[in-house]
């Protein structure tokens, strides 16, 4: 037993096994996988050689013990694989850009080594293999292993290859990290090499070569920075995901070191899965005196996998492309996509359509003089408690590739924009992005928006229109990108909407902020026998079966939604000239209606016109169309009208108008406005849809007033002709 426990490992045999694996492992098509990678390295096409444990597992000559040793002593085996690659490295077969300085230095070193200089018997003068290498070796963990949370990584994992999931909260700048320090002696002229394996090292000052010792000369060493080897280095903070934090606990974070080709792969706000070596890091300086035997820990990253890719990075697989092509041919795709959002939440079809358009967005516009017009949609859901506002927010954050969820009461102005902190690596002041900066090119969901302090809420004004965060703190004056779509949820001023008060009193948000929202959706909880009964049945079904009732089609899964939206976002539709007058007329009519109203329901500004354009373009994107159609504009106007439907329906009840009478008034006013006795059916349907009425109500109105000889209906087209009485 004791002999087995103290079994020594023959690292020469391990190197031979690693070399055999690299030389003989075949890919899925029978090609030499790693030899092809080494050829690309020799041709200077790539620098990183990633060895996958999945390949080692399937290799016939590698046993379980070898796999276990690689997993438990990964740092040592990276060196073993690097030595094996040195022996297998082929000659270059293609011309590549030459680094003249590096090649001249290496040629000179080889010549000096042949003369007994750099490769002499003195170990400090022996050229380390690291300085010759122009590649980096990474070992990737098993793909099917469930990632650990930061809380689950224990002291027993020290030195092992682990896989951890989390969200990136901070990234340092990329700095050069010395890997091999090269010195030149003033007396003997020899090059002295010093390998650096830690973050700090003690430079050499006195030449230790044999020649200086024989001559009894204390040669002074000069550090040659140009001849030394540096590696890109970046420090990242990885924090536990919200769902992994036990109730009442603070999220834990872990320092991650990225080197070489892994730098600049992540940004704050990314949800990632990292595999790497869990290592201790002893304190140094005065902190070491206080810490004693205690050491800090960090993860030396070996591979990075993004949980949700950005839309522009999304690459469709073969089956996904076919599925999207089938969906695009579906005439009812707009409704199906919308109903696939949070299917367990009853109703809110139009709200879900608006949230779908928020995910799609419109392209950003940049004018010739540099002025930018945002393309992201901003939506505010305001309504009574218990109408599933927060659940909708959380579902959208789950579907979006990049999203940050926060609450108004728990967010400060600094927490939303940016804070100035001291970088522990360089002791410099650095900016740490807040929620809006973390959600750059994504969605920032702010719950309890009405409960934010006014001073904190003003920080959002610039983000919502200019899409930047301007900072002037601690000597740092800069502007950060915050190209985010804001999705806010708020309650009315008195908890519930009070119909006795004006909309402005109930909404209780400043006009400067309201005008920045493309859609302010009022969701009021009104008693209705049929609706309440359907909702109760739906909730009971979800509670018992843990899934939504049948929708008549299979709801699309979030990955499919992301794939469809990513394809739609690549389309850049334009507004044709023939629609310009139509949109302008629609906007002016909204302004006229608001001017006539005693208690206006919204603040209509020129931003409203831009909102109509953005929503129309988003609808065209969903159809993969290069041009905006009139139906897109009509749907955009309908959504804007339906967002206040609860208020309009109440106004109609107070004024004593039923749906039939109101539809007749709308059609009569349209005929008077156009000075025509005829109204086309399609145009009439668009008009009443904007006011929140259905096609069934329009047909009922047409039949009733046709029987009264007010108008005549065409038997085939249903066009309306007023009878001149």
From Swiss-Prot:
* Protein name, as recorded: DNA replication licensing factor MCM7
Amino-acid biosynthesis among keywords: no
- Relate the assembly described in the record: Component of the minichromosome maintenance (MCM) complex, a heterotetramer composed of MCM2, MCM3, MCM4, MCM5, MCM6 and MCM7.
Q: Spell out the reaction equation it catalyses.
A: ATP + H2O = ADP + phosphate + H(+)
**Known Gene3D superfamilies for this protein?**
2.20.28.10, mini-chromosome maintenance (MCM) complex, chain A, domain 1, Nucleic acid-binding proteins, P-loop containing nucleotide triphosphate hydrolases
Q: Gene encoding this polypeptide?
A: MCM7
The UniProt entry, under SMART domains, shows: MCM
Q: Record's Gene Ontology CC terms?
A: chromatin; cytoplasm; MCM complex; nucleus; THO complex
Q: Which organism does this record belong to?
A: Oryza sativa subsp. japonica (Rice)
Which PROSITE patterns does UniProt cross-reference here?
A: MCM_1, MCM_2
Its localization reads: Nucleus
Gene Ontology BP terms: DNA replication; DNA replication initiation; DNA strand elongation involved in DNA replication; double-strand break repair via break-induced replication; pollen development; regulation of DNA-templated DNA replication
């Amino acid at each position: 037993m004791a002999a087995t426990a103290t079994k020594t490992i023959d690292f020469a045999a391990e190197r031979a096994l690693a070399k055999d694996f690299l030389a003989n492992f075949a890919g899925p098509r029978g090609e030499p996988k790693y030899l092809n990678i080494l050829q690309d390295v020799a041709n200077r096409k790539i620098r990183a050689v990633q060895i996958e444990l999945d390949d080692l597992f399937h290799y016939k000559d590698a046993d379980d013990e070898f796999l276990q040793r690689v997993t438990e002593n990964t740092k040592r085996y990276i060196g073993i694989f690097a030595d094996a690659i040195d022996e297998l490295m082929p000659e270059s077969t293609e011309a590549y850009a030459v680094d003249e300085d590096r090649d001249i230095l290496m040629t000179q070193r080889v010549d000096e080594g042949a003369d007994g200089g750099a490769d002499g018997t003195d170990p400090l003068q022996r050229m380390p293999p690291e300085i010759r290498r122009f590649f980096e070796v990474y070992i990737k963990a098993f793909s099917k292993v469930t990632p650990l949370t930061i809380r689950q990584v224990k002291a027993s994992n020290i030195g092992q290859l682990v896989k951890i999931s989390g969200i990136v909260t901070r990234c340092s700048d990329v700095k050069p990290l010395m890997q091999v320090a090269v010195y030149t002696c003033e007396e003997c002229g020899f090059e002295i090499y010093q390998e650096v394996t830690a973050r700090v090292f003690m430079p050499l000052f006195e030449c230790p070569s044999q020649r200086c010792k024989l001559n009894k000369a204390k040669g002074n060493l000069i550090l040659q920075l140009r001849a030394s080897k540096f590696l890109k280095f970046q420090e990242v903070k990885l924090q536990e995901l919200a769902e992994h934090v036990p109730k009442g606990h603070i999220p834990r974070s872990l320092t991650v070191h990225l080197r070489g080709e892994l730098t600049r792969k992540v940004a704050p706000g990314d949800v990632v899965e990292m595999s790497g070596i869990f290592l201790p890091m002893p304190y140094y300086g005065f902190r070491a005196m206080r810490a004693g035997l205690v050491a800090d820990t960090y993860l030396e990253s070996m591979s990075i996998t993004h949980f949700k890719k950005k839309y522009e990075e999304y690459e469709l697989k073969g089956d996904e492309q076919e599925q999207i092509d089938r969906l695009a041919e579906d005439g009812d795709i707009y409704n199906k996509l919308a109903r696939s959002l949070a299917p367990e939440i009853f109703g809110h079809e139009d709200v879900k359509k608006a949230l779908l358009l928020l995910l799609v967005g419109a392209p950003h516009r940049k004018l010739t003089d540099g002025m930018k017009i945002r393309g992201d949609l901003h939506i505010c859901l305001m309504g009574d408690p218990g109408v599933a506002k927060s659940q909708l927010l959380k579902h959208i954050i789950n579907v979006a590739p990049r999203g940050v969820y926060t609450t108004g009461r728990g967010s400060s102005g600094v927490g939303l924009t940016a804070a100035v902190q001291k970088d522990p690596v360089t002791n410099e002041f650095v900016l740490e992005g807040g929620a809006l900066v973390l959600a750059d090119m994504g969605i920032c969901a702010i719950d309890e928006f009405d409960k934010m302090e006014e001073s904190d809420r003003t920080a959002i004004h610039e983000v919502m229109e200019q899409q930047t965060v301007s900072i002037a703190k601690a000597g740092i004056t800069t502007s950060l990108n915050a190209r985010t779509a804001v999705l806010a949820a708020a309650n009315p001023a008195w908890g519930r909407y009070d119909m006795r008060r004006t909309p402005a009193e109930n909404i209780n948000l400043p006009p400067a902020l309201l005008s920045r929202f493309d859609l302010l959706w009022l969701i009021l909880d009104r008693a209705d026998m049929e609706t309440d009964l359907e909702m109760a049945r739906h909730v009971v079904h979800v509670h018992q079966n843990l899934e939504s009732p049948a929708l008549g089609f299979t709801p699309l899964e979030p990955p499919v939604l992301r794939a469809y939206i990513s394809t739609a976002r690549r389309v850049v539709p334009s507004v044709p000239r023939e629609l310009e007058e139509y949109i302008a007329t629609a906007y002016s009519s909204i302004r006229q209606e608001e001017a006539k109203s005693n208690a206006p329901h919204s603040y209509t500004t020129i931003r409203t016109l831009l909102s109509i354009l953005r929503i129309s373009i988003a609808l065209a994107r969903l159809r993969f169309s290069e041009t905006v159609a009139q139906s897109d504009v009509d749907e955009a106007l309908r959504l804007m009208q339906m967002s206040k439907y609860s208020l309009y329906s109440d106004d109609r009840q107070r004024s004593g108008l039923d749906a039939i009478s109101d539809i007749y008034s709308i059609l009569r006013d349209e005929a008077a406005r156009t000075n025509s006795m005829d109204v086309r059916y399609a145009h009439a349907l668009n008009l009443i849809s904007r006011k929140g009425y259905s096609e069934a109500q329009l047909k009922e109105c047409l039949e009733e007033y046709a029987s009264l000889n007010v108008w005549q209906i065409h038997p085939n087209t249903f066009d309306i002709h007023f009878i001149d009485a």
